[in-house]
């Protein structure tokens, strides 16, 4: 017996915009997960409410079974890409573990500093990209060398020492010194 759910979807289409406009993003996400229509969430997300929405999606994915968790993460990735938050999108792509998604995210970012940050993230998660060929090819020789160095973690120890010097924590301190 097939159930006509057009009335239900009509109500959902009225409730979701209301929740998204009135800071009830988790309720909207829960409702869409329940009716299995999470795909329409991206249409209602704006720059103002994307952070709470994606944080909730990212948190929910840990508690969902195998195929549903990936769907939730894909929606979070799509929202981050829509609002041009590429480093957050890369964090979600690393959690998904899909090479094509990581490549798409890397290619979307044009800012060199954002690309450097993404290379640090990819190196940390153990997902190196081929930057000298393929879909993520970097044509600038200096940038290519720098990004490959970052992705190989070859300067990681030196970077930690620089951070320790900047924070002035190279030497142990007594409570009186602080």
Residue locations for each model-derived region?
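Extended alpha-helical assembly domains of large eukaryotic scaffold proteins
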Residues: 1-178
């Amino acid at each position: 017996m097939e159930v006509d759910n057009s009335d239900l979807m009509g109500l959902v289409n009225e409730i979701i915009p209301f929740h998204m406009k009135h800071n009830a993003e988790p309720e909207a996400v829960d409702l869409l997960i329940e009716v299995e229509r999470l795909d329409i969430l991206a249409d209602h997300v704006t720059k103002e409410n994307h952070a709470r929405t994606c944080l909730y999606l990212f948190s929910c994915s840990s508690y969902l079974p195998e195929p549903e968790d990936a769907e939730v993460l894909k929606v979070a990735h799509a929202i981050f890409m829509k609002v041009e938050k590429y480093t957050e999108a890369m964090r979600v792509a690393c959690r998904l573990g899909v090479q094509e998604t990581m490549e798409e995210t890397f290619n979307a970012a044009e800012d060199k500093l954002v690309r450097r940050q993404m290379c640090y993230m990819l190196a940390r998660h153990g997902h190196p990209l081929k930057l000298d060929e393929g879909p993520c090819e970097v044509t600038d020789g200096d940038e290519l060398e720098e990004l490959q160095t970052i992705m190989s973690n070859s300067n990681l120890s030196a970077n930690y020492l620089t951070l320790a010097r900047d924070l002035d924590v190279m030497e142990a301190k007594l409570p009186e010194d602080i």
